[in-house]
Design a protein with these regions (language model features):
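N-terminal beta-strand motif that seeds the catalytic metal site of vicinal oxygen chelate
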Residues: 1-8, 62-67, 116-117
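Short, charged/polar surface micro-motifs in flexible loops or helix N-caps
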Residues: 40-43, 52-54, 72
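Vicinal oxygen chelate
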Residues: 22-25, 35, 76-117
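Acetyl-CoA-dependent GNAT
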Residues: 49-51, 114-115
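Short, charged/polar, Gly/Pro-enriched secondary-structure boundary elements
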Residues: 41-45, 107-110
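Core segments of cupin and vicinal oxygen chelate
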Residues: 1-42
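Short glycine-enriched loop/turn motifs at secondary-structure junctions
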Residues: 57-62, 93-94
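Short amphipathic alpha-helices within nucleic acid-binding modules
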Residues: 12, 72-78
Length: 117
């Protein structure tokens, strides 16, 4: 994911969503890369900052990331305390799952999913 403010974005994924920094790398062309992952997962998200490129503008509804949470109501309250209120939801799906969305830095949207009991 291209970002304009790498450290602010890394801080959000670490401090707000609880992801961990797996590694940092600077490419030969100067791109700064930070790989983050959820605990106990091999899946990684690559955050990329290109210092000599124009500012990134994320198109609305272009993409989003989704994370499963155990207790959406509790997690939403914690997010609100940190300055990230829900932007949509919570909504119960036909399957019984509950979903909600927050706006992350850089214009990306994060979906939170509490699976049906």
């Amino acid at each position: 994911m291209r970002v304009n403010d790498l450290e602010r974005t890394v801080k959000f994924y670490q401090d707000v969503l609880g992801l961990k920094v797996v590694r940092r790398h600077t490419s030969p062309r100067g791109a700064q890369l930070v790989f983050v992952a959820t605990p106990n997962s091999d899946e990684e998200i690559e955050l990329t900052y290109l210092p000599n490129s124009p500012s990134v503008q994320v198109q609305p509804d272009l993409m989003h990331l989704a994370f499963e949470v155990d207790d959406l109501e509790k997690f939403a309250a914690e997010l609100k305390q940190q300055g990230y209120p829900l932007s949509d939801g919570p909504t119960r799906t036909d399957s019984g799952a509950v979903i909600a969305f927050i706006d992350a830095p850089e214009g990306y949207e994060i979906e939170l999913i509490q699976k049906a009991p």
